[in-house]
Amino acid sequence: QCGQAWC
């Protein structure tokens, strides 16, 4: 899972 915009 990712909570950043640059995944």
Curated annotation (Swiss-Prot):
Entry note about domains: The cysteine framework is C-C.
Subcellular compartments: Secreted
PTM annotation (Cysteine amide): residues: 7
Any GO CC annotation of this UniProt entry: extracellular region
Molecular function in Gene Ontology: toxin activity
Modified residues (Pyrrolidone carboxylic acid): 1
Organism: Conus imperialis
Upper lineage: Eukaryota, Metazoa, Spiralia, Lophotrochozoa, Mollusca
Name listed for the protein in its UniProt record: Bromoheptapeptide Im
Disulfide bonds listed in the record: 2-7
Tissue: Expressed by the venom duct.
Primary location group: secreted
Modified residues (6'-bromotryptophan): 6
UniProt function note: Does not elicit gross behavioral symptoms when injected centrally or peripherally in mice.
Entry keywords, A to Z: Amidation, Bromination, Disulfide bond, Pyrrolidone carboxylic acid, Secreted, Toxin
Record keyword Hydrolase present: no
